[in-house]
Amino acid sequence: MVQIKAAALAVLFASNVLANPIEPRQASVSIDAKFKAHGKKYLGTIGDQYTLNKNAKTPAIIKADFGQLTPENSMKWDATEPNRGQFSFSGSDYLVNFAQSNGKLIRGHTLVWHSQLPSWVQSIYDKGTLIQVMQNHIATVMQRYKGKVYAWDVVNEIFNEDGSLRQSHFYNVIGEDYVRIAFETARAVDPNAKLYINDYNLDSASYPKLTGLVNHVKKWVAAGVPIDGIGSQTHLSAGAGAAVSGALNALAGAGTKEVAITELDIAGASSTDYVNVVKACLNQPKCVGITVWGVADPDSWRSSSSPLLFDSNYNPKAAYTAIANAL
């Protein structure tokens, strides 16, 4: 059905003059444009220099169908500051330049995270030194892309499954206050960027991790910590899409201005699951956008579970068509 519909659409719209030529197998109007028509900011995906150059179909699909890009790895600490005070931006510059030249919003990912953290950072046990290093890292990375990045994941994956704060290196050395320091540093560097806390397994309203995050965010926001949004990664197992609506509504009650689905992929990529997630964002006024964590299955970190909207041949799946029709 997808191939038949795509072929018909290709004939129907072959004569149209479009600013961004689309792949003939895709919908005539991008799913991003359809999503924005409902008042949302973007329906995006991820990219980096390797994946953008690996297969020519990847940038073509991004240009045709997605309105936002998140760097998969090139803005993480190990990529941007592998040695203390020695910054490297070649990978992140490539992604930002591609996004800007093609009119895509950018979500910066990620500034403070316990993983992909260089050993030199993990070897710092003096509180004052680690605070200075963290602030310098945030300031240097954000300053380079000031005015170019719509939103930043300032802190990433800082909660345990029981809703308590993860005992990361930053937590163990600085204490909970590292969260406030990180957000206040980020706000000072780029007052116009949206500042997010991002985490996974926030997919059920009653799950302890979600309720713990909401309670902490309420406390931080009330104390003046400049958290603008909550990002729910939304890496789902098959059949889990139905619970996302309730989860987003719960996250929206934490007191931030925005929520977003930041790393969406769904095992099996069923049409029902994907449409449920898209509708969950559509129906929550604070949900500004969705980022799918990859274009096609071969480039997914969960490739064996076929979780994305495009298959191993970079052709759209039934879930892609279902989203286009639902919008």
From Swiss-Prot:
Annotated Gene Ontology cellular components are: extracellular region
Instruction: Write out the GO biological process terms.
Output: xylan catabolic process
Q: Per the record's keyword annotation, is tRNA processing included, yes or no? A: no
> What Gene Ontology terms describe what this protein does at the molecular function level?
endo-1,4-beta-xylanase activity
Residues carrying Pyrrolidone carboxylic acid: Q26
Pfam families per UniProt: Glyco_hydro_10
Q: Which residues form the GH10 domain?
A: 55-326
Listed SMART domains: Glyco_10 (SM00633)
Gene3D superfamilies for this protein: Glycosidases
What reaction(s) does this enzyme catalyze? Endohydrolysis of (1->4)-beta-D-xylosidic linkages in xylans
The organism's superkingdom is given as Eukaryota
Return the EC number.
3.2.1.8
Where, per UniProt, does this protein localize? Secreted
May I ask which residue range the UniProt record assigns to the signal sequence?
A: 1-19
Instruction: Provide this UniProt record's keywords sorted from A to Z.
Output: Carbohydrate metabolism, Disulfide bond, Glycosidase, Hydrolase, Polysaccharide degradation, Pyrrolidone carboxylic acid, Secreted, Signal, Xylan degradation
Query: Which stretches are tagged as propeptide in the UniProt entry?
Result: 20-25
Q: In which pathway does it act?
A: Glycan degradation; xylan degradation
- Here the disulfide bonds are C281-C287
PROSITE patterns (UniProt xref)? GH10_1, GH10_2
Broad class of the protein's primary localization? secreted
Q: Which family is this protein grouped under?
A: Belongs to the glycosyl hydrolase 10 (cellulase F) family.
Kindly provide the name given to this protein in its UniProt entry: Endo-1,4-beta-xylanase
